[in-house]
């Protein structure tokens, strides 16, 4: 189901200009996203939770003495952005905890992440632009982080005034069409989740581009709302509510795929009482496990009753329990003779014949009992299933634009989305140069994505200005903390960080030598003169960061709509720029493994787009491990302090 959020009011143009000129910063930066549209749980949604009494759920940070003091010290350390006196920055330890204790209840799940960056030189995309190779849709990922530089021309109107947002919807439409074009199913792969022996499905980007006619789209949208809201019909899993089966026995069936609501590591610990059991949460499309009777008249009544049950998203307030369901249906069915007859019929039917075949026949009858044409139901199901990727955040600052897309089934596991734009351009704070950073929590791992456009220039010493931009971005980037709104969080405080964009680092080599080595594809000799690689080796900037091996030609500077580097034709009146690897992708943190680092041959701009694919190990809370650890601790405590006997 979709949850519509209130529409943000349009910002007044003069206020935008004044805020830019006066360098006024809001407390919280807004961003755009798709409407919330959750998907039913599957075997990919780990971990499951069972009702367990006597559980006191705490984080390992709480187990250390002096936790508050250590966090206060940590806040003081990062209050200046982690910048040392010498001008560099020092990476701080975000957690002070025992990894041994942490391993007792945390699992690791591999998530495939694609990071893509492209300086489009202010060019608007054509309607038929193909970016499949750039986004590597043949090797689909779980998360796509797509960054642009110069998405609008860097003229005075966009820099000093309200930037043009016209190209953004067009780029988003192309990205959405590309990611949701294919509908292939890849093979099952092994995923280190809660159950290492379980096979988890790895979906590729879905098929058939969304080119349906407007009338079909409207019909499908209306059908989705009616089926989900009025009949509690789950289009994704073909499961239906059956209230009659629930009448004889209302005890909940154990579903191992029920997910544990994620809790960010910086949030307050949740205390679960020892007497009451853990309450389960249903996703917006999850079914209640009931069955409708064979009689359509009885089915309509039970469907109307089931509609009264309130649903909840897994990461929101736990407001639905089986006791509430049981009490509600008991009250409604106690005075209903139809309910008793339907339950008796269902009980008699279930006693003979093949139960599995009977369920399939009942399912077909249920579909027809709603009076809906099967072709419309199928069309509605296809439209819903085709949207496998949704946009969870996008943000523009002048020419810098970053957009994050994620599989719809993973959206429920994303929390604490924050954005932080930092301008380091004209006057030291204008947005023609700078960065847009995104912070989010996926399961229990904090991730940060930094899309930047650094100072240009190929003269000697220009790399020092770029280094200064990096230090300034790290110092000024702030994310409001979930634990304490007054305590900022910085880029190095995350578990995994990805920095990408037009970093503008050049080659310390003459133009003629560069072009000669490029023509001979001698990349290793060129890399020895690369400014960024030298800085990484010396530790002057991006200390501790990593970059994959570069095995592709320099990405800058090309002639527009051509495969020829600019400056090769000496008779043309153009700036002479030696080829360079200006567009880069770096990463910092544990559990990151790079699979691919490449560029794509799209000739629209004077830059070539760059892509990197990663396998990222994110932390997932495992309730089973926590239960075992608590049992061991309780047993040890009982052995040391035995209960007195009377």
Swiss-Prot record:
Comp. bias (Polar residues): 188-207
Tissue expr: Expressed ubiquitously.
Recorded superkingdom: Eukaryota
One Gene Ontology term from the biological process aspect of the record: seed germination
Biased composition (Basic and acidic residues): 59-74, 341-350
SMART domains: IPPc
Region (Catalytic 2): 575-590
GO MF annotations in UniProt: inositol-1,3,4,5-tetrakisphosphate 5-phosphatase activity; inositol-1,4,5-trisphosphate 5-phosphatase activity; inositol-polyphosphate 5-phosphatase activity; phosphatidylinositol-3,4,5-trisphosphate 5-phosphatase activity; phosphatidylinositol-4,5-bisphosphate 5-phosphatase activity
Pfam families attached to this UniProt entry: Exo_endo_phos2
Protein family per UniProt: Belongs to the inositol polyphosphate 5-phosphatase family.
Protein name from the UniProt record: Type I inositol polyphosphate 5-phosphatase 2
